[in-house]
């Protein structure tokens, strides 16, 4: 039994060896004649020991190759880490590279956490700002509506208080009056101006209406502004030297107009005195001559004063006109007596 079992084991070993040899033809390059010889005449004492040695050597060589490849890859990775950390420094050992990478990772994680906290704070602040913005928009719309309501109430009050408020714009009514640095003329209606409403009608003038006498003055009467405007005019007049030459002409024209008005008033008073029923003709004729001389003296004095001053006004003509009307009015009760 023992011999038979040994024979079976040898046959099985030979078969396994044949299979291994067929699979490893590149490693164990043996000619086919030797293989046939081994198959025909196997040596059971020598072949198993050689096979075991070959298997162990092959395994060791494969393991060494794998280890070499793994170390080469690790070295490449360490070189890349060193270049990322500090490419200018020389090559360090693996321990320093690992410590530097660990420290850098810790710093990066702390920065990431800090940025996350800042992001959350900024998001909360942005929400608050958006809420405030919406509140301000609502307040703005409410204020606009209040302003519109107040404007409507103001317009309604203007229309109820003044009849012309409906036709005029409230912006025009609220605007301040313009200030002119010089006197502006006022437009008067064309026609005659009532001078002496108590005088009787005379056919000499050809006017049937006793209260209306043709006015010798033009249709525009000079407008006297307040004192502030006159002072502004006195400040602005020296800047224009051309106005000095125009002032005497205007004054002369105004004096001639006032003299014409005085002559017409004197003619009217003389005709009134020549009417029947007048007792003292000589006294009444002498009075207009005296008044005329006084008026001329007043005109000369006013011209001299105006030449020294820079103010431009039409007060002398208005005063002469008022004095002539007062003289004429003062003569009427004497004549009536």
UniProtKB/Swiss-Prot annotation:
GO BP, sorted A to Z: intracellular iron ion homeostasis
One Pfam family matching this protein: bHLH_IRO3
Gene3D superfamilies noted in UniProt: Helix-loop-helix DNA-binding domain (4.10.280.10)
Comp. bias intervals (Basic and acidic residues): 244-263, 280-291
Main location: nucleus
Signal peptide: none
GO CC annotations, alphabetized: nucleus
Subunit structure: Homodimer.
Protein name as annotated: Transcription factor bHLH121
Organism: Arabidopsis thaliana (Mouse-ear cress)
Gene label: BHLH121
């Amino acid at each position: 039994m023992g011999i038979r079992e040994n024979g079976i084991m040898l046959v099985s070993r030979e078969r396994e060896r044949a299979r291994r040899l067929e699979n490893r033809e590149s490693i164990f390059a043996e000619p086919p004649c030797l293989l046939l010889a081994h198959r025909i005449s196997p040596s059971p004492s020598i072949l198993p020991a050689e096979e075991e040695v070959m298997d162990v050597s092959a395994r060791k060589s494969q393991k060494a190759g794998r280890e070499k490849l793994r170390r080469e890859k690790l070295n490449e990775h360490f070189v890349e880490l060193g270049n990322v950390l500090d490419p200018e420094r020389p090559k360090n050992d693996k321990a320093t590279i690992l410590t530097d990478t660990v420290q850098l990772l810790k710093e990066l994680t702390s920065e990431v956490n800090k940025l996350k906290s800042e992001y959350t704070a900024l998001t909360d602040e942005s929400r608050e700002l958006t809420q405030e913005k919406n509140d301000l928009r609502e307040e703005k719309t409410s204020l606009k509506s209040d302003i519109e309501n107040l404007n409507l109430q103001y317009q309604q009050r203007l229309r109820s208080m003044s009849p012309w408020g409906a036709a005029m714009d409230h912006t025009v009514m609220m605007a301040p009056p313009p200030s002119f640095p010089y006197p502006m003329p006022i437009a008067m209606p064309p026609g005659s101006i009532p001078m002496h409403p108590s005088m009787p009608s005379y056919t000499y003038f050809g006017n049937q209406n006793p209260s209306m006498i043709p006015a010798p003055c033009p249709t525009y009467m000079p407008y006297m502004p307040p004192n502030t405007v006159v002072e502004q005019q006195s400040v602005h007049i020296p800047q224009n030297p051309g106005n000095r030459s125009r002032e005497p002409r205007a004054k002369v024209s105004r004096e001639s107009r006032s003299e014409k008005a005085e002559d017409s008033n004197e003619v009217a008073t003389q005709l009134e005195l020549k009417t029947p029923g007048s007792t003292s003709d000589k006294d009444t004729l002498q009075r207009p001559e005296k008044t005329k001389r006084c008026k001329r003296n007043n005109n000369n004095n006013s011209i001299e004063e105006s030449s020294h001053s820079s103010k431009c006004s039409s007060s002398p003509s208005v005063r002469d006109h008022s004095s002539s009307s007062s003289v004429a009015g003062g003569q009427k009760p004497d004549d009536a007596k």
